[in-house]
Regions:
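Substrate-binding/catalytic cleft of secreted carbohydrate-active enzymes
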Residues: 46, 59-174
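N-terminal carbohydrate-binding accessory modules
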Residues: 1-54, 72
């Protein structure tokens, strides 16, 4: 006998990745993106996102986790989101020695995986999510990003996974 009901809007649509392209319902999408972080109320964010959509923006790139209602707004308006894990180390280094950068420090792998898992489980049921990003633009690459990519590929079979710091390495789909 159910003890609790939680309402959740469902969106229809599939996001997949093939031949270097993000597909929505099997068709390639032309992404016109903008960085956006909901630092406002629901009503203000709704108005801002509607205005961005009116300008032709169809994809939002938040820098960090957003309030749950942000994803609900995007689901409702048909705006796509490339969700980013909250991995933004202050140390920016291209030092590829073990420990030379936080992303290549095996002591931090648990923290990296926890953030990627939180991102995935928080947003996996939102139809607006078309791809996942493994951290900020300056997150660097290395052991922790490899492990994060492998874990995410193990649970997410359809959406693209992006590591902007991969620079030609294997741990990114785009």
């Amino acid at each position: 006998k159910p003890r609790e009901y939680i309402s959740f809007r469902l969106g229809a649509g599939t996001s997949t990745f093939a031949d270097g392209k993000i597909l929505r319902n099997g068709k390639p999408i032309a992404i016109k993106s903008a960085r956006y972080n909901a630092r406002t109320t629901y009503d203000e964010a709704l108005a801002e996102i509607k205005a961005l959509k009116a300008q032709g923006i169809n994809t939002l790139l938040p820098d960090n986790p957003q309030p749950e209602w942000f994803y609900d707004i995007c689901d409702g308006l048909g705006v796509y989101v490339i969700e980013r894990a909250n991995i933004n180390p202050n140390e920016q280094s291209q030092n590829r020695k073990i420990g030379g950068t936080p992303s290549n420090n095996p002591d931090l792998v648990g923290e990296y995986l926890a953030r990627v898992k939180a991102m995935y489980y928080r947003t996996r049921n939102h139809s607006c999510i078309i791809a996942y990003a493994l951290g900020g633009d300056a997150a660097g690459n290395g052991y922790n990003m490899y492990k994060a990519y492998q874990w995410l590929k193990g649970v997410e079979k359809n959406r693209a996974i992006i590591c902007t710091s991969a620079e030609g390495e294997w741990n990114t789909d785009l």
